[in-house]
Structure formats: C-alpha cells, structure tokens
Amino acid sequence: MAHARDPTGAEIARFIATRTGAQMVQLMRCIKEPAAQAAFTAKLLVVPPAVSGRPATPEKARKALNAFVGFRCYYVTIPMFKSWPMKKLSNLIGLLWEADPNKSLWSLMAKAWSTIRDQIGKDQAPLDQFFRIICPHLKLPDPASYLEIHGWILTVNEEGDPTISRSADSEFVSIGTGNTDVALSVEDIITYVQSLGYAHGFILDDNKPSSTFLGQSVSSTLEKNTSAISVTQATPNAAHARFLVRNKRRAKRQAVRNASYRASLDQDILIAHQFNPAPVDEHMPDCHSNTAPVLDQCHNPSPNQFYDGITTLLSDQIPTGQGDAGHLDNAHLFNDYSLPGDVSFITIDDFTTNMPNLIDYDAFRLGADEDVALPIFDDITHI
C-alpha cells in the first residue's frame, strides 16, 4: 500500500499554474487562516501565466515586398528631391520606374529581403541598410547619379511643382550586374549581405532549392551602349517600313474589291437585259443616252423575245382593215369595238373572227348554263 506524501514545491506551482479563475477563488475560500491566505496570495504573484491547451494560431504569412516599393525607398533619397514632399514626388518616381531597365533585379532583391524579414522580423532587417549594401554590389546607380546616368532632367513648372523629362540626345543603357556573364539567385543576394554583417540571425536552408533565379548575359558597357543606340534608331525606321507595307497591302485588297464590284454590276446588267455576257474584265461603255433607245445605240443587239411576244399579242387585238378585208362587209368581227361586252360572241348572227383558235368561254359567264359542254383545252396535257 502506497503511503501519502507531501507534494513538492514544483508540483504545487504546476498545480496552481494550471487552475482556472473559478478554481483559484474556491481555493482562497478554503483557506481559513489569515497568515495562510497572505502566503498563498504572495505565491500567486510570482506564478507564471497559465498555458492554454489550445494550439497557437499560426501567424499569417506576410505579403512580399513589391519591387516598385523597394525602388522608391532607395531612390526617394535623390538629393534633388529633398525640396519637395513625398506626395509631389510619387508621380516622378513612377515615371522613373516605368523607364528603369533593371526591374528584374529589383524583383530579385525584393524577394531576398522578404525572405529575410519573414524569418527574423522587420526590426532585425532594415530595408534601407539592405539596399545600401546590395545595390552597389549589383552596379546599380546610386541616388546621387541616377538622373544624370539615365538622361533625366528635373525642372520646376509655373506652379512650383517638380517635373522630369528625358533629353532627346541622351545615351542611357541598362547598367547593372557587372561586366561579366552572371547567374543570380535569391540565395546569392542573402549570402552576400550576410557576409557584410547584415541579418546575422537568418539561417539559410541549403537543402531548399532557389525559388527565384535570374540568368542574365551582360557584355561590356560599350557594347550595350552601342546596341541600345542602334535599337533606338532602328525602331522608328522599322515601324515606318511596316506602316508602308501595311498600307500597300490594304490598297491592293481594296483595288481587287472595287474591280470585283464593277464586274459583278456589269454582269447583273447584262443578265437583266438578256444580253450575251461580256468578259468580266471588259469595260462596258456607257453608250446609251436619255434621248435615244438603248437597243439602237448599243451595237443593235438581238430583240428581246419576251417583249416581242407582248407587242404581238396586243397588236393582234387592234382592228385593221387590211387584215379583215377577206371577211363579209356585214360580218361582226371579234375585235370590233361596237359589240357589247355582255353578249355571247357565238350567238351573234354573222359572227366571224380573224382569230382561228378562238374558244367559246361563254360557259364561264355569270348565270351560264351549267350543263353546257365545256371547251377542250388542247394545249394542256391530260394525265
């Protein structure tokens, strides 16, 4: 049988440290002697805070430093900018950033500093000190000479605000990363700044591959300068040449469209008049006028059979003395204007006609005999 023993001081301290507020109040009530209460209260003052059983909430990942923000933090110290507040310099620094040729380097430096900050904190990794160490190593222009190297001119407008413009004859190049072929990574930047005493508390994981890597082939400054100038001069000429070639292609396509429209219109006109179509590429002369018939002037083409048939049909109904001379004098002709329109021609005495194929259609008159024999249409094929 185990014997009861008194708890040690460490066990008592651990027991008290793990009690809740309600349990501590209950313990105070159980102590009756004033001296014991005073001793217990003094003990509570030196007890460490209670440890919660809940897991600690993981710290939210910080947002990586933006490359433009890093560029602005470094070049806002340009000596010529000291006369104006930051709100008047924001637009100028934005213009400098848009034309800066080393954006890839600034992105790599921002990634390296963000990696250091996330591990040891911002207080242990000052941003301005980081740029003062790494920018000269990468041969980036210092703030005092940046405007001059890149051909920027600072002026003051009528309102007293600063403005910048680039001189037309300036010869600026992408300056940075030395004069040799380089391959740069985030780890390379961190290793270099640590070698100069920056961020001693940062521990680099050698087993983790680099997530950001910059490969860049850089020739001599003279070769870069010559290449930049030649590209700058060749760009307007090449753009102008492309513009001329494009306009020439458009003019050629438009000429083909116009020719096809004219040929199609000429073809439609010929088909409408039932002429023999002329060749597509042959120009159709405007030979007719407003005073002369078209058929008489356009080389006298063959008459239209459709119009001739209509003319013959209408002219046959006109009474002519020469055509009716063979009939009796007292005979009533079919095309005689004196005949009433509501009288059957067949029932008229001495009816005669100069139309041999006339068919009696009296059976179709209103009130006609239903039993009358209908005429046979010989020109219709019976099925």
From Swiss-Prot:
- One GO biological process term: positive regulation of mating-type specific transcription, DNA-templated
Q: Where is this protein chiefly located?
A: nucleus
Q: Mind telling me which InterPro entries this protein's record contains?
A: MATalpha_HMGbox
A GO molecular function term, named singly, is:
DNA binding, bending
Q: Where in the cell is it found?
A: Nucleus
Query: Per UniProt, which keywords does this protein have?
Result: DNA-binding, Fertilization, Nucleus, Transcription, Transcription regulation
GO terms for cellular component:
nucleus
* DNA-binding interval(s): 60-117
Q: What does this protein do?
A: Mating type proteins are sequence specific DNA-binding proteins that act as master switches in fungal differentiation by controlling gene expression in a cell type-specific fashion. Transcriptional activator that induces the transcription of alpha-specific genes.
Recorded family membership: Belongs to the MATALPHA1 family.
Write the protein's name: Mating-type protein MAT-1
Q: What is the lineage of its organism?
A: Eukaryota, Fungi, Dikarya, Ascomycota, Pezizomycotina
